[in-house]
């Protein structure tokens, strides 16, 4: 969030880095050599919130991919509901079943020839928010979450059949 404008965007390049301490990574491709609003806001504020997209909120979340100027909010455009965070100043999105409040650990410019091609962000999760309906005995119910992944372009994917394989001892 910058100057009272809450920025949002769907990113497919997001992953777990560590469970202890809980850390995640995000990668932001530059457009014509320019940083995206989201990464610029993360680097300046040193805080951000990551949400898990699910089958119920994916259409609204997709609207946040709109190419808006920095003074316009993708969150407002998508009619998503901001909710106050506990440990960071950046609000979260009420419609997400899981959200992670994060502090910036590292930012790294990568790739490109004359200018960087992307930024890699590593954030420490300082607060988890998980809906009670999908959380039991320290585990998230993947069926209840109904997570959706962003692939590329206009493509998203639902999680298919879930199966279990015992780990060797």
Describe the role of every protein-language-model region:
Residues 1-169:
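Basic, polyanion-binding surface patches
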